[in-house]
Curated annotation (Swiss-Prot):
Stated name of the protein: Large ribosomal subunit protein uL1
Subunit text: Part of the 50S ribosomal subunit.
The family this protein is said to belong to: Belongs to the universal ribosomal protein uL1 family.
Pfam families: Ribosomal_L1
UniProt xrefs under InterPro entries: Ribosom_uL1_bac-type, Ribosomal_uL1, Ribosomal_uL1-like, Ribosomal_uL1/biogenesis, Ribosomal_uL1_3-a/b-sand, Ribosomal_uL1_CS
Database matches in PROSITE patterns: RIBOSOMAL_L1
Species, as recorded: Salinibacter ruber (strain DSM 13855 / M31)
Amino acid sequence: MANIEGKRYQDANELVEEQDEPVKLREAAGLAKDTATANFDESIDLDLRLGVDPQHADQMVRGSITLPNGTGREVTVLVLASEGKQQEAEEAGADYVGLDEYIERIEEENWLDFDVAIATPDVMGQVGQLGRILGPRGLMPNPKSGTVTMDVADAIEEIKAGKIEFRVDQSGNLHTPIGKASFSPDELYENAQALLREVIRLRPASAGGLYLRSITLSATMGPPVRVDRSSVLSEAR
């Protein structure tokens, strides 16, 4: 099995190495899809290196966006709310709904069987104690990302439809899945373009010099495909 996987990666790598220079985003989307040769529906990921220093609060790049073609995966949603909002959350399709019992499970059992947590503002006093567990994993409800809200039905609908959160890490890198290998090249391109436009829009005013330092697209088991930065900036206008 290892030899087969190694041969697949080698073939995929040779396909990418044929490109001497970075390619336009649309071509990169097709190449990334072509390099996905594993026996499962690989994720297609967009990786950015940004010219920011996240250790400075005014250079943190974070946000959320609903990808035009969704993410291609089922998203498990936990809603932490008082009883008055729990029925609304259940009817909107939340996978787990409650409050005290889930806070207890997370604290005592380190239970994390969900992708997104939504909380209503009135319970954040209780939910806040989960910050040390959920925060480092990017699961803590946050007003800026729309996951602290009284409009739980709308929030659930957006997340299930393909809303994602993104945040630059301490080294200025941003890694975000933008679809699956089963997507068409056009769908992958549209998702990547939407995310890039949002990241460009969020450029911190204090970030000097080159902002988009590198852009690559890759399948889970495939090599990175380099994307031409100038073409991305041109298309984002």
